[in-house]
């Protein structure tokens, strides 16, 4: 049976087009958004169950592209580069941390290995609501996790950035050659290559079916990430865990089509070993936006910042200069990460055909005074705190 939600305002969060619809009506059928429009102008199904949400707003569920809380959050530091390891083997669906994130409106996460090595392995995109792994799965592989900077220095005997960049290049070179051999075989131009499970991820990367999510920060480190991953090897990659003073590279990131997903540190402070700031405290998102970068999002690095504080990350961006005139902060936790991860056909905005992952909020989610009152995932109510109700698909209380 279709459902209709009537709300004071709908935050569309699309990549382009309308920011909002006042006095909105949204139709949900079979777990998908069927239509959205202005109440009185949108034809409603005669058999629909109508929920009038009064002065509340509706918006799409939020997406976090840097999370470690869908399982243990650790990584096996066997080698400096471990492209074959899979975080999907370590998932505990709808665990307590994911529940808290869900209650705050985070409906999709990229669960990835940690940053103890330059290449921690393969991430997995998951819904945060109740259900099995198979029911939660959005896409595997969700990404190849690459980490640059200080954390992987601690691996083994210790190494500096030059050697780490060498390791990354060698692995990418092997992986790209492996993917090319398989492409030649599939075109009927060569014999079947020997299968190497630890390099299979590069077939997905070469075919643009997934991306490299890159734990990268500081100017020099982000410069290496941009030049190596996308500039030299042509893989789709994005800045993930973007922090500190990387925004002066916005021009290069934009030129290479690399998005900036920022956090868990949203603020830059004056330091001796960086460019002069004249005593200013600067926001990372402000810097990228000031330079004209079109794709800026936010992440938590949960549990470093709790999963439920993803909207607070965007609020900090706004507090430190990010222009939110057209709800760019809401887009930064919805459609921007969805597009970057290649799942915007499923989630990220209120549009016909997408999963009915919908939030009922009391106002702009980048305003810390706003709260989430209801959460739908794929057309099912998974949280309703208006009357402190919360039940999973079997009717069991969630918290």
What are the functions of these language-model segments?
Residues 8, 12-14, 19-22, 339, ...:
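C-terminal cap of metal-dependent C-N hydrolases
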Residues 9, 74, 81-85, 211, ...:
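His/Asp/Glu-enriched, well-ordered alpha-helical/loop segment
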Residues 69-72, 114-120, 219-223, 244-248, ...:
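Active-site environment of divalent metal-dependent phosphoester hydrolases
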Residues 1-45:
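N-terminal metal-binding scaffold of metallo-dependent hydrolase/deaminase domains
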Residues 86-87, 182-279, 297, 323, ...:
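Active-site core of metal-dependent hydrolases
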Residues 8, 26, 31, 55, ...:
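Divalent metal-coordination and catalytic microenvironments
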Residues 102-236:
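Polyanionic/metal-chelating signatures
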């Amino acid at each position: 049976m279709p459902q209709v939600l009537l709300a004071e305002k709908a935050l569309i969060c699309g990549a382009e087009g309308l920011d909002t619809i006042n006095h909105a009506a949204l139709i949900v059928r079979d777990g998908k958004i069927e239509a959205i429009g202005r109440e009185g102008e949108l034809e409603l199904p005669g058999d629909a169950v109508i929920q009038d949400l009064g002065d509340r707003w509706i918006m799409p569920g939020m997406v976090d592209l840097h999370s470690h809380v869908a399982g243990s959050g650790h990584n096996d530091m066997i080698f400096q580069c471990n492209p074959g390891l899979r975080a999907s083997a370590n998932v505990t669906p709808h665990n307590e941390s994911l529940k808290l994130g869900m209650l705050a409106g985070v409906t999709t996460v990229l669960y990835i290995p940690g940053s103890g090595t330059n290449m921690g392995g393969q991430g997995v995109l998951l819904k945060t609501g109740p259900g099995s792994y198979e029911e939660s799965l959005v896409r595997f592989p969700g990404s190849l996790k690459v980490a640059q900077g200080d954390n992987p220095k601690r691996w083994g005997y210790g190494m500096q950035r030059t050697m780490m960049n060498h390791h990354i290049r060698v692995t990418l070179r092997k992986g790209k050659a492996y993917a090319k051999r398989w492409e030649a075989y599939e075109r009927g131009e060569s014999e079947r290559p020997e299968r190497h499970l630890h390099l299979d991820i590069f077939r997905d990367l070469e075919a643009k079916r997934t991306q490299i999510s890159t734990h990268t920060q500081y100017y020099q480190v982000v410069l290496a990430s941009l030049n190596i991953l996308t500039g030299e090897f042509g893989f789709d990659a994005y800045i993930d865990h973007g922090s500190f003073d990387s925004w002066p590279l916005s021009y290069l990131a934009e030129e290479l089509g690399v998005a900036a997903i920022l956090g868990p540190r949203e603020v830059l402070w004056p330091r001796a070993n960086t460019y002069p700031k004249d005593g200013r405290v600067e926001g990372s998102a402000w810097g990228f936006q000031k330079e004209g970068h079109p794709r800026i999002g936010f992440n938590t690095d949960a549990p470093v910042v709790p999963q439920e504080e993803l909207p607070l990350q965007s609020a900090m961006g706004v507090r430190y200069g990010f222009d939110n005139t057209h709800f760019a902060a809401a887009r930064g936790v919805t459609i921007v990460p969805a597009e970057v991860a290649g799942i915007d056909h499923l989630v990220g905005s209120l549009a016909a055909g997408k999963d009915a992952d919908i939030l009922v909020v009391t106002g702009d989610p980048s305003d810390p005074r706003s709260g989430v009152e209801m959460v739908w995932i794929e057309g099912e109510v998974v949280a309703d705190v208006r009357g402190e109700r919360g039940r999973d698909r079997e009717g069991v209380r969630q918290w």
